[in-house]
Amino acid sequence: MLTGAGISADSGVPTFRGADGLWRNYRAEDLATPEAFERDPRLVWEWYNWRREILATKQPNPAHDTIVKLEQQWGDRMWLITQNVDGLHRAAGSQRLSEIHGNIWTVRCTGCGVISGNREIPLPILPTCRLCHALLRPHIVWFGESLWEEDLRRCDQAIHSCDLLLVVGTSGVVYPAAGFASMAKEAGALVIEINLESTPQSDLVDLSLQGRAKDLVPLLL
């Protein structure tokens, strides 16, 4: 299963992109980059603290809960790939998943590379590592950065070995995830899309269902 922003929208999570995502007249594309963090880490952390404050008020919805139930039914035959960084899948109870863009509740040391969970709100501006005292950054894949090799390997394995791929709430334009549906089709899988509206991949999937994830995903049970 592959999920995107559409599944979290039903929990009230904003996209943080476009006009609705402006913060102090900055776009996400202006702040979520290695260059922005190197230039002004304080500004970037202020933005992430703002996002964390918003996300702390959000809860998993019936679509997240259904995915957990499917995982419990299917066991190791299921793998969840999400583009979302809000942590709602984990909050719902999903365990077999790849958060390919990272998790906003996880930080990484820019010095020693140690990764740790952190739900402190707000984080101290310019938080530092307890081990080496170097600056911490969000453990998130920023614009211009590559996905982590282990996640890419695990996703490639899951996509090429699956019999069924469910694509829920994705725009179909952000790569490499935008290519997963065609990869699964080429490998012989049945591909079903659930989204509010048609996407660039709607014509290649076997079934495209339009509607809210929180309404349609529970029907899979």
Give the location of each predicted region.
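Conserved catalytic core of sirtuin-type NAD+-dependent deacylases
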Residues: 1-221
